[in-house]
């Protein structure tokens, strides 16, 4: 690894608006003879038992009395010493060992005074390593990614058709094979940043563009803003590495001199259901706030949740992609995650599951703690909206939209326009932000994936065999039931919707009983049917097909409520697996985190502000110490005008410099002065900062300065008595009589008729949220 002199960012970068299985988090097996003063071998690029692509970056540490010329290194008996070169200081050598065969390999190092060996287990660059069998069908999109047609990997009529090309490189109609795993040759090209602020292809003749911009890196050097971009495929997904490069660089002898030895892993968000290679994002690959300062940027379509939300596959992809980067460029001084929404989720999940193997620090934007626990309350949204819009439509309470928060917890507005109501004023976060997520994630019959590549993917009609649910996308995690559908942890047995509103007197006991008798639940995947209007536009000519709630896939009362609507039980295997797998953020994370978001509550945006504090609460639940996480909010009323991320990068660089210089002090004690809880106005100017600005959210202190400025809301489960953490899929139950004795209903003491009705609605009991959720160990 090249030497590096730490130079924290001195100035704030210019703003640019931007919108594992748990066991595998353990460290790598120790190399033989590692540690102390003996000769040892360290695997730098990955765990020794999780090597991919046939190569690994190794470091051999010499023992006293030995010199570099004394060293011999072999790979399964073949001499590979020439791959190793002395590091600064001369007491170790680093080399990229290639030619590893699939399975176990042995690398041995020998010098005059000692020897060591390490066993390396190699996996295909197409994966998988630990995520389970590959998903099929899997749509290849390499042409869209600028990589050309995928490589032929079978002649069995499975996957995307690959066509012969003519003398001009144009595709003919002749099929020469198929690609199931979507591999592609690696492509390197060069771009430049124009003085107008765009990235453009560098002229092929190497001439200097007249509008070539210059940029100043972290160490103060001003260089041409030229970017080298490498693209290829890893774990079946497309990846890119970008970093500054000199104008006229020889491709065969790449010059990393402008790299500041830091890496940004740029994670992207969105909601995808898999079965596709995804799409490369120009903004993600070419992240100007980082590239302009000399950071290298890693990006993969497999770490973009718009592609899929199986974060075991995502974590595996991140590890493999980081491994490839290290093999090519050496070990960075640190890797910081950047990315919003699902990109923020990935930072929390991968930081939890893999320690510092993917990222050493995190800057999650608009984050949630994870995706899967959002399904708990988002799965309630349309059930409650349907109740208020249809079942209880005559009730004037629900005509005032802000009253809907009594049941949904999430924010509501009497001002925000509603596209499902002729754009009249009045909506909820459930409607404005989450409508459409129910069919996308729960209905196996519906998908928004209409990519044209399906037309040339074989066997014909294979797309129609996919069960389009999040559960099935991650079936290797949740498991598969006897009916062939993935198991689901979603559950609302015993959930008393509107309990807090009942206790406060905002709804009557009669209304509470009516709601819980009629709200219902979701059908099983096997019983669901195709969606109606507006999700299937072809049927919108028939008013009877209008069904924005997906009510056709609900379990409702068969007789208007006399018989209580069925509730849905989460699958016990899925419940155990979702907790054990690492898909749930449990708070087990120790890396530095600057959690930043715009305050978007007034817009009913899905990135609601409570999530930052849910993350903190879970970290506190884990070990009582959340000092590694700081929370920043920037006001976005009336609109988002300032991006605080460049400042977060600057502060994080100072934080990492402290950890590098004083590792014995740990994360919290190395915080720079600005690594504290803060809130900002729309221009990015600080309103307040310090340890008490968010008081009153997770404690009973008077509201802090930022708490007062930026109020948060709840969820359907918190206003049903559930915990702030929001991580209970299936509650443990208590008898209705026990709940009454414990005062769960406040001043309401049900009479005999009401008690009988409660027991009809909840025959197995009601939620006891003083106990941990079912399936959690």
Question: Predicted segment positions?
Answer:
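C-terminal His-loop and adjacent cap/lid subdomain of alpha/beta-hydrolase
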Residues: 35-777
